[in-house]
């Protein structure tokens, strides 16, 4: 009976809550109406499609990417689609000063922030890893460190709005695959960092959600070009993928899986890890968790 009370019952409650809240909430487009949203990597691919979906829902958007020409076209289309407002600031996420200042400027343009969608990556080629340490450093800085910088800069505004962060990751951040070692390392790092921050926000009663979006192969132009002749797999549509990211983030889900296989969230969702994380909190001195 003691085992049931101390271990099995909490596990049952945890999983019932997890599956109930992850399957029974309904998304409504009006959830995004008037919301102030940042989308990075927004000049093409999934980022561009998210900007278009958000605009149709009546959100304010500030977009960023390296291509000013691409951003101009996307912003123009966003306004046509019904965005409450649409702006862009071009720059590279290799520059951490730009990454931080962009958040500040975007917040001023919109008068606050409700949702931060971190979607950008640096381009890499599929190849076996040998000794290119410079490539590893560059990928980690853009794909991981800039995410940390931007979310840190955005957190004060998100605390005021009880907002949300979407972190765009990949199956490569949940499982190992050949020829993408630096990219995979950056995506595993996102999971480790932002899942920890999610727990800390929960413990300190800060009402900011973090949604880790785990994506399979998506039919973006860049991805299709990179895998040509190397990987033979069917890609999922970027338009639907973008919408699922927005839905999951608006519903404040911890994780969103978007892949061709319905088994992916079951196989990679890692319930054992969630159980371990749940019980590990019992050993902490709760007085140490004081929100600033």
From Swiss-Prot:
The chain crosses the membrane at residues 8-24. Disruption phenotype: In null mice, 11-keto corticosteroids cannot be reduced to active 11-hydroxy forms. Plasma corticosterone levels actually are elevated at the diurnal nadir. Males display adrenocortical hyperplasia. During starvation, induction of hepatic glucose-6-phosphatase (G6Pase) mRNA and enzyme activity is lost and the induction of phosphoenolpyruvate carboxykinase (PEPCK) is attenuated. Liver glycogen levels significantly increase in the fed state. The liver shows a phenotype of partial glucocorticoid deficiency, despite somewhat increased basal plasma corticosterone levels. It is a single-pass type II membrane protein. The active site is at residue 183. GO terms for cellular component: endoplasmic reticulum membrane. Widely expressed. Highest levels (mRNA) in liver, kidney and lung, lower levels in the cerebellum, cortex, hippocampus, ovary, testis and thymus, no expression in colon. Keywords: Endoplasmic reticulum, Glycoprotein, Lipid metabolism, Membrane, NADP, Oxidoreductase, Signal-anchor, Steroid metabolism, Transmembrane, Transmembrane helix. GO terms for biological process: lung development; steroid metabolic process. Residues 25-292 are lumenal. PROSITE patterns: ADH_SHORT. Substrate binds at residue 170. Its EC number is 1.1.1.146, 1.1.1.201. GO terms for molecular function: 11-beta-hydroxysteroid dehydrogenase (NADP+) activity; 7-beta-hydroxysteroid dehydrogenase (NADP+) activity; NADP binding; protein homodimerization activity. Homodimer. This is 11-beta-hydroxysteroid dehydrogenase 1. It comes from Mus musculus. The lineage of its organism: Eukaryota, Metazoa, Chordata, Craniata, Vertebrata.
């Amino acid at each position: 009976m003691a085992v049931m009370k101390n271990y099995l019952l909490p596990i049952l409650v945890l999983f019932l809550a997890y599956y109930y809240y992850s399957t029974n909430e309904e998304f409504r487009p009006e959830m995004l109406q008037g919301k102030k949203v940042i989308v990075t990597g927004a000049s093409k691919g999934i980022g561009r499609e998210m900007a278009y979906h958000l605009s149709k829902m009546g959100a304010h958007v500030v977009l960023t990417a390296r291509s000013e020409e691409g951003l101009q076209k996307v912003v123009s289309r966003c306004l046509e689609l019904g965005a409450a407002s649409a702006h862009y600031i071009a720059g590279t996420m290799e520059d951490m000063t730009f990454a931080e200042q962009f958040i500040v400027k975007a917040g001023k343009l919109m008068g606050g922030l409700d949702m931060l969608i971190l979607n950008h990556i640096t381009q890499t080629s599929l190849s076996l890893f040998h000794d290119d340490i410079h490539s590893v450093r560059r990928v980690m800085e853009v794909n991981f460190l800039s995410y940390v910088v931007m979310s840190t800069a955005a957190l004060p505004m998100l605390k005021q709005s009880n907002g949300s962060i979407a972190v765009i990751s990949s199956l490569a951040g949940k499982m190992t695959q050949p020829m993408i070692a630096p990219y995979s390392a950056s995506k595993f790092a996102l999971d480790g960092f932002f899942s920890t921050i999610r727990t800390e926000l929960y413990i300190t009663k800060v009402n900011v959600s973090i949604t880790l979006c785990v994506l399979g192969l998506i039919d973006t132009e860049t991805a299709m070009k990179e895998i040509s002749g190397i990987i033979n797999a069917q890609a999922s549509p970027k338009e639907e993928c973008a919408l699922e990211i927005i839905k999951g983030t608006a519903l404040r889900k911890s994780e969103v899986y978007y892949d061709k296989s319905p088994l992916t969230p079951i196989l990679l969702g890692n319930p054992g890890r969630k159980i371990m994380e749940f019980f590990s909190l019992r050993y902490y001195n709760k007085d140490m968790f004081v929100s600033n």
